[in-house]
Amino acid sequence: MPTEANTYDPQRIESIAQHYWDSTHAFEVNEHSNKPKYYCLSMLPYPSGALHMGHVRNYTIGDVISRYKRMTGHNVLQPMGWDAFGLPAENAAIKNKVAPAQWTYKNIERMRTQLKSLGYAINWSREFATCQPDYYVHEQHMFTRLMRKGLAYRRNALVNWDPVDQTVLANEQVIDGRGWRSGAPVEKREIPQWFLRITDYAQELLDGLNTLDDWPEPVKTMQRNWIGRSEGLEIRFEVRDVDNNALEALRVFTTRPDTLFGVTFVSIAPEHPLALHAAKSNPGLAGLLTQMKQGGLSEAELKTQEKRGMDTGLKAIHPITNEQLPVWVANFVLMAYGTGAVMAVPGHDQRDQEFANKYGLPIRQVIALKEPKNQDESTWEPDVWRDWYADKTREFELINSAEFDGLDYQGAFEVLVERFERQGRGQRRVNYRLRDWGVSRQRYWGCPIPVIYCPTCGAVPVPENQLPVILPENVAFSGTGSPIKTDSEWRKTTCPECGGPAERETDTFDTFMESSWYYARYTSPNAREMLDKRANYWLPVDQYIGGIEHAILHLMYFRFYHKLMRDARLVDSDEPAINLLTQGMVIAETFYRKNPDGSKDWINPADVNVECDERGRITGATLISDGQPVLIGATEKMSKSKNNGVDPQIMVTKYGADTVRLFSMFAAPPEQSLEWNEAGVEGMARFLRRLWTQVHHHASHGPATALDITALDTAQKAIRCKTHNTIARVEDDYGRRRSFNTAIAAVMELSNTLARFDDTTTQSHAVRQEALETMVLLLNPITPHTSHALWQTLGHPETLLEDLPFPKVDTTALVRETATLAVQVNGKLRGTIEVATDAPREHIENNALTEPNTARFLEGLTVLKIIIVPGKIVNIVAR
């Protein structure tokens, strides 16, 4: 039904449009279409209970692209689901004394309502939550396949252990080395965990990046660095104990064998077998290893912690010089990386140098410039020359390296590799920084790992006909241990191979497992198998949208899991997504007051009055409730910790969904940070009210007659030219550039131009009708509710605008018959003239000289020359 109100009423308009979309199942799609497919997907949300502005921006970008693509003739899929397992639900369960499942499903209901209020063109019939058994059963089935193929395996690995809560902690739950809830010092504990062999796909993941032409370079660079391919030499160092007995040889991988003569000690990880062996007879070392178990495992902590170590008393024999090198335990060497041992070259490596300086170990130079440019370059200082260890491009040669003196990096590399391989003491290797994916989590709220442990048969995959292994949802959750560990009825079972008593695995999957394949399940949401033939119709995703913070975890696992599904013959494609758009953050001002202890109480911007200078910069702020000053902080990402978030629902209620959508697209290009500014939101609301009034005022003059482009005068042609120029700009902005802010600006320009067009003739009414229809359709991807209503106001029946073709450029309208030229006198603007585009020079000069305001400024002056810039400027030089 058309809206008759002349006042812009967002709630009424949006209710009518959304009811129409729901009742007509407007955004349901299938695979039986002769249109080209287009799969647009924004990363699925975690059901925290409330949308934030980051969600709104992400999903609005996806919705704009989806609606635009449907208007350009595509069969568009835009689904939605919920990444529903995970730690926040457990934390909320502890805080609110409610089962994680109950908390999660309640939040999904609320967030679904919020998403629908924003009018997104989502195919809701494909919705699912990853915590539902009919979703994760397929994940369990895939895991059992991977076990049988040897791509899933179990081994011991270090975790953060809270000795009070008796639970494993994620890195983010370790605060300054202590458990976030108990406050107890966290220990590093080695426990059995399941892994997927992502390293088997390391080279393919690396090579595949070269095919992703439409992924941002920063994402591809981060993935290349995370995969970390390096070519080098694995060297065997013989090891002797304090009694000169031979122990198992130490394997060390290095990309710089040319620095071998600079090795003055060997560092090993605290968990290395040699460290544990030495500690048996060294109480001091045993005590240090116990201390090194304290603290978290995050890379950030390991990088910033104080470097600590101890001499084990063991000696590594230099493979060329036979020098006995001390073997030190060092807390910065990780057992999970490489071989857990490092040949230390403190003369040319910062970390080794800092360690050597602390413990008085030798530092030796083995690299020198061939042709030093100055005294500084020829004088060796370790804190300068350490940088050479990583610099292979400078012109240098080996020194203090026996018969290898004078060789450059490449020459030394090849000679040493050949020598070690010939002697059987080493071999060329390709190494990757990438580690196998640890998928075990010692948590309750996750997908159960489908494995049974039998004393006789060992680890046995759950048979397919016994899947899914269903996670009990109606549990009491305290945070101390996992409910399924203490649920003997759930845990105890029988071995599927021998029939004897057995127990289920009580670990659950890393939640990245669910988010690594959800995009594919949307294509076959009701399939009995993991996927069916519909997957190959929709995949790969044409446009994927999400934050760059997911570059090296989700997006890596996303690509890896797609290759697993390909190798299982579930999908045909090699990569999961063709285009990737990484949207910027939503940021906002922060305000606070300082407490006597120096801590800060963060105040929400909605509770603050601000004063601004003429440039709009905040110069002062007071708390609304007491009128007293508050301090102005930095502009930062919206977050709970800084209390600078804005509730989208409040904004939708206050301004309407289309205003919120319009601002989120107008305030910044998609890839850049968007600074929240309510004054800007109010500006968008004013524009929509003005457009509403503009259309209704036009419609009040009755229906337009047919446009006769052969009967238009100059002014009418100018409006048509502006209209079709706007179509061209917006089409490029939506389609190629993904520059939605400039698309909006172009429509605003057209609206302003039309507002100044006051001709009331029949053909002018028709020209205005075309311009207004164009604006309504161009804005439809961004402001669909308003466009839905205004299309009817312009005399059309209620319809789905996405099924109408996107406006087409009439190239004949772009041919301008006249041009507006600025007229300057001695470089200063004095007037404008309108002339035919093919007007002769004499005609242009005469019009410029006789333009009234220009003529006034020329009185008493002699014209020396006239410079004409075709189509732009006439500059009169006079004295």
Swiss-Prot record:
Signal sequence interval, chain numbering: none
GO cellular component: cytosol
Domain of life: Bacteria
Listed InterPro entries: aa-tRNA-synth_I_CS, aa-tRNA-synth_Ia, Leu-tRNA-ligase, Leu_tRNA-synth_edit, M/V/L/I-tRNA-synth_anticd-bd, Methionyl/Leucyl_tRNA_Synth, Rossmann-like_a/b/a_fold, tRNAsynth_Ia_anticodon-bd
Residues that, per the record, bind ATP: 640
Key word Ligase present: yes
Subcellular location: Cytoplasm
Chief localization: cytoplasm
UniProt GO molecular function: aminoacyl-tRNA deacylase activity; ATP binding; leucine-tRNA ligase activity
Record field: catalytic activity: tRNA(Leu) + L-leucine + ATP = L-leucyl-tRNA(Leu) + AMP + diphosphate
Motif 'KMSKS' region, residue range(s) on this chain: 637-641
Annotated motif 'HIGH' region, positions: 45-55
Keyword set includes ATP-binding: yes
Matches recorded under Gene3D superfamilies: 2.20.28.290, 3.10.20.590, HUPs (3.40.50.620), Isoleucyl-tRNA Synthetase, Domain 1 (1.10.730.10), Valyl/Leucyl/Isoleucyl-tRNA synthetase, editing domain (3.90.740.10)
Entry keywords, A to Z: Aminoacyl-tRNA synthetase, ATP-binding, Cytoplasm, Ligase, Nucleotide-binding, Protein biosynthesis
E.C. number: 6.1.1.4
Gene Ontology biological-process annotations: leucyl-tRNA aminoacylation
Family according to the record: Belongs to the class-I aminoacyl-tRNA synthetase family.
Protein name (record): Leucine--tRNA ligase
Species in which this protein is naturally found: Xylella fastidiosa (strain M12)
